[in-house]
């Protein structure tokens, strides 16, 4: 399973970071809560045919 952390910044930039475990995804999402530059962080479980949203921060 692959996990993706989609970061949406105040300047409109969207960046995707990929992780091999939910723990890594959760840890990095927690760090996002301390950033003043991030509007939203979305945790996704990435599948072959569709993605599942696990959480949204922001």
Where are these regions (language model features)?
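Short aromatic-glycine-(Arg/Gly/Cys) micro-motifs in beta-strand/loop hairpins
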Residues: 1-14, 46
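A short, exposed loop/beta-hairpin motif centered on an aromatic-Gly-Thr core
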Residues: 12-23
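Serine/proline-rich low-complexity intrinsically disordered segments, especially terminal tails, linkers
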Residues: 6, 23, 37-38
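Short, surface-exposed linear segments at secondary-structure transitions and domain or protein termini
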Residues: 23-32
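Short, mixed-charge low-complexity intrinsically disordered segments
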Residues: 32-58
């Amino acid at each position: 399973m692959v996990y993706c952390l989609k970061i949406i910044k105040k300047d409109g930039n969207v960046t995707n970071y990929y992780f091999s475990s939910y723990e890594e995804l959760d840890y990095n999402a927690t760090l996002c809560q301390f950033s003043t530059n991030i509007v939203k962080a979305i945790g996704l479980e990435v599948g072959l045919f569709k993605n599942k949203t696990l959480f949204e921060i922001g």
